Curated annotation (Swiss-Prot):
Name of one Pfam family that matches: ATP-cone
Taxonomic path: Bacteria, Bacillati, Cyanobacteriota, Cyanophyceae, Synechococcales
Top-level taxon in the UniProt lineage: Bacteria
Keyword Nucleotide-binding: yes
Start-end of unnamed zinc fingers: 3-34
HAMAP family: NrdR
Protein name: Transcriptional repressor NrdR
Role noted for this protein: Negatively regulates transcription of bacterial ribonucleotide reductase nrd genes and operons by binding to NrdR-boxes.
Cofactor, free-text remark: Binds 1 zinc ion.
GO biological process: negative regulation of DNA-templated transcription
Domain ATP-cone, chain residue ranges per copy: 49-139
Keyword Nucleotide-binding: yes
Sample GO molecular function, one term: double-stranded DNA binding
InterPro entries: ATP-cone_dom, NrdR-like_N, RNR_NrdR-like
Length: 161
């Protein structure tokens, strides 16, 4: 590793530790020439994932865009930001494990819905309303009835339609 102080190419590792939740390795190094100490990080290079939007447009996967959508859906719920970041990390890891480098936005939306459903019904409905492009009250009612049937299958419900 090249020293940032004198540009010498030889250094020794003084200390290594896992960082960023196991996603990188932090190394303290010392230049063998000038004895300057510096820190480097080693990260796994993630392969790019392309998202195919509903209109056919292709975009690079943007974890911050996904996180923003989830934060908005979870406003005024008990789900904290760190939990949402963890969910996004899990979704991103899932995408990296897929053999295909392209994925439809609907598949990502379904992953988010699975997580949010376990966290908060309110967040689930909010995200589903945007992701599913709800057109009106009937779409909300259908989704609420589906949630209710799945949560309490032994009950019988009157439908509004």
């Amino acid at each position: 590793m090249q020293c940032p102080h004198c540009q010498h190419h030889n250094s020794r590792v003084l200390e290594s530790r896992s960082s960023e939740g196991g996603q990188s390795i932090r190394r303290r190094r010392e230049c063998l020439e000038c004895k300057h100490r510096f820190t480097t990080y080693e990260r796994l290079e993630l392969l790019p994932v392309t998202v195919i939007k509903q209109d056919g447009e292709r975009q690079a996967f943007d974890r911050s865009k996904l996180l923003r959508g989830m934060v908005r859906a979870c406003e005024k719920t008990d789900i904290n930001f760190q939990r949402l970041e963890h969910i996004v990390e899990e979704i991103e890891a899932n995408l990296q494990q897929q053999p295909k480098r392209e994925i439809h936005s609907e598949a990502i939306g379904q992953m988010v819905l699975q997580y949010l459903r376990q966290e908060s019904e309110v967040a689930y409905i909010r995200f589903a309303s945007v992701y599913g492009r709800f057109q009106g009250i009937a779409d909300f009612v259908d989704t609420l009835e589906q949630l209710q049937r799945e949560q309490y299958p032994e009950r019988q419900y009157l439908t509004m339609t």
